[in-house]
Amino acid sequence: MKTPFGKSPAQRSRADAGHTRVSASMMKKRTSHKKHRNNVGPSKPISQPRRNIVGCRIQHGWKEGSGPITQWKGTVLDQVPVNPSLYLIKYDGFDCVYGLELHKDERVSALEVLPDRVASSRISDAHLADTMIGKAVEHMFETEDGSKDEWRGMVLARAPIMNTWFYITYEKDPVLYMYQLLDDYKEGDLRIMPDSNDSPPAEREPGEVVDSLVGKQVEYAKEDGSKRTGMVIHQVEAKPSVYFIKFDDDFHIYVYDLVKTS
């Protein structure tokens, strides 16, 4: 991990060189697309049962190699059912959702559950919130010179725990982000695209079981010929062909449309 005051995203390498990444200049007024990544490190065994920390505010130290210990604070959003060691976390000052094995990764130190709780807020427009889920959108970001830059993406779901936030991903950078999209919509920075396909979803027979790839191991071939492995950890309810993938060598949660072919 890097500290928020470390290198800008444009100065860091990405695990997957085949994807266009977020430029350091693509910033919103309130926050910015900041990301940190790292290679997989050693793990430490869990010696005793752990308390449920989902929904808790946490802080911990992070030490990478011979570098200094940096301090991180954030909110635990979820514990992944197919890999209970893995937690999804929204760190303060960063827009990506990160996946970490908080109790097993030896680079995590002094993990502390904070007494402050996540404030529960009422959604300002429940109908609009429901309407935008599963929709393609154009999301405007303000650059350093004050101009607007447009990012096409898809709203995936309401985020857990932080109930005024939404999961979203982008064509340019298919990792999992979260924003308060209702505010952006009302400010004119988010536009819902017309449906490109108005046909209704295929009807299911009563009792029909739909195959899911959740829990499956995956292998991804990069443009340089190397391969990376990971696990499918979540299926998007609004778009069942879309899944979250956690690769073994990366903290980001990737979002891919895995259309099953025969």
From Swiss-Prot:
Entry superkingdom: Eukaryota
Region described as Disordered: 1-49
Parts of the chain that traverse the membrane: none
Tissue expression profile of the protein: Expressed predominantly in ovarian granulosa and thecal cell.
Compositionally biased tracts (Basic residues): 27-38
Subcellular location: Nucleus
Keywords attached to this entry: Cell cycle, Nucleus
GO cellular component, one term: PML body
InterPro entries: SPIN/Ssty (IPR003671), SPIN/Ssty_sf (IPR042567)
GO BP of this protein: gamete generation
Family: Belongs to the SPIN/STSY family.
Job of this protein: May play a role in mitosis.
Protein name per Swiss-Prot or TrEMBL: Spindlin-W
Organism: Gallus gallus
Lineage of producing organism: Eukaryota, Metazoa, Chordata, Craniata, Vertebrata
